[in-house]
């Protein structure tokens, strides 16, 4: 399949570029082998900020009442999943815009203008690699002990 632009990765760099390209008349294919939205939305920034917000709310209640409320960890994790799912649905909605084809497959290069994904070949004069980053645990003593929770869990 021939297209104007191929983007590998659907994080903020990928989906914003796809939307901009499509608005400017380029037929764009965007590939993602994981969940739409990339690391920040699914395993990094957003889940972390959601859990931190939950902790801040617990601290605020404790400050106002003078006693620490009972915490339901499973509910906090469910809330984290709800927030990321809602934002991911928004990104998936953007990927349904006219001029954008979203393909949930791992993409690899055959040559400088050809991508192979899901057993199919895709060609474009321009290919953007927007694979972003991976979350990483900081070197903090005890971080690998039981009871430590990361945004990935």
Regions found by a protein language model. Give the residues of each.
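N-terminal glycine-/charge-rich "phosphate-binding" loop or analogous flexible N-terminal tail
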Residues: 11-17, 21
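Beta1/beta-strand and adjacent pyrophosphate-binding region of the FAD-binding site
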Residues: 1-13
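Glycine-rich flavin
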Residues: 2, 19-26, 31-153
């Amino acid at each position: 399949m021939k297209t104007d632009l191929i983007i590998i990765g659907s994080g903020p760099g990928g989906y914003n570029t796809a939307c901009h390209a499509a608005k400017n008349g380029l037929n764009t294919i965007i590939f993602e082998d994981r969940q739409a939205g990339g690391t920040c939305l699914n395993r990094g920034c957003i889940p972390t900020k959601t859990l931190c917000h939950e902790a801040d709310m617990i601290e605020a209640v404790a400050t106002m009442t003078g006693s620490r409320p009972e915490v339901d960890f499973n509910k906090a994790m469910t809330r984290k999943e709800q927030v990321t799912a809602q934002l991911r649905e928004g990104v998936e909605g953007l990927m349904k815009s006219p001029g954008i084809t979203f393909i949930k497959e791992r993409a690899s290069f055959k040559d400088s203008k050809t991508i192979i994904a899901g057993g199919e070949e895709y060609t474009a004069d321009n290919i953007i690699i927007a694979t972003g980053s991976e979350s990483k645990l900081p070197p903090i003593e005890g971080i690998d002990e039981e009871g430590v929770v990361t945004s990935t869990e």
